[in-house]
């Protein structure tokens, strides 16, 4: 299965992706992990990305897309993947569609983890990260909503909405059921 995972910060995408990756036998590909790996290994893309990150800027779409393309070309992603953190915009969704098309593949679905803002705030505050305060979290949620609403419209009937409140196991069971697994 070739899936994109969407959901606000704190929705539990990473937690669910780890479980789904194991149960479905496909890799969880996170842009955050790709950035860290490429920077850590000193790859040309990593060096380029690090310059933006060090300057406090967003890594441009073309750099991120090249990292994703390189990762999707690896053999373990041939039969499927869980893509987390890309695409974030309609432009990136089009880039992903082109990458898959070039490989004779299509996206099977877009799992959209839905969770209330208050639950996200509660979850993120409980993580105890220094940069997580309520104001910062609500700002990040606003950015996510503005960025992602057009993406949800763009994917239309590929969207698989999952209610992401409750226990990890419950959310995972809902996801697998919605995927027909």
From Swiss-Prot:
One of its GO terms (molecular function) is adenylate kinase activity. It is an enzyme of class 2 (transferase). Residues 126-132 are annotated as: LID. It catalyses: AMP + ATP = 2 ADP. ATP binds at residues 10-15, 127, 166. Keywords: ATP-binding, Cytoplasm, Kinase, Nucleotide biosynthesis, Nucleotide-binding, Transferase. Pathway: Purine metabolism; AMP biosynthesis via salvage pathway; AMP from ADP: step 1/1. The keyword Transmembrane does not apply. Residues 30-59 are annotated as: NMP. It is found in: Cytoplasm. AMP binds at residues 31, 36, 57-59, 85-88, 92, 129, 140. GO terms for cellular component: cytoplasm. The keyword Kinase applies. GO terms for biological process: AMP salvage. Its EC number is 2.7.4.3. Its main location: cytoplasm. Catalyzes the reversible transfer of the terminal phosphate group between ATP and AMP. Plays an important role in cellular energy homeostasis and in adenine nucleotide metabolism. Monomer. Consists of three domains, a large central CORE domain and two small peripheral domains, NMPbind and LID, which undergo movements during catalysis. The LID domain closes over the site of phosphoryl transfer upon ATP binding. Assembling and dissambling the active center during each catalytic cycle provides an effective means to prevent ATP hydrolysis. Belongs to the adenylate kinase family. This is Adenylate kinase. It comes from Corynebacterium glutamicum (strain ATCC 13032 / DSM 20300 / JCM 1318 / BCRC 11384 / CCUG 27702 / LMG 3730 / NBRC 12168 / NCIMB 10025 / NRRL B-2784 / 534). The gene is adk.
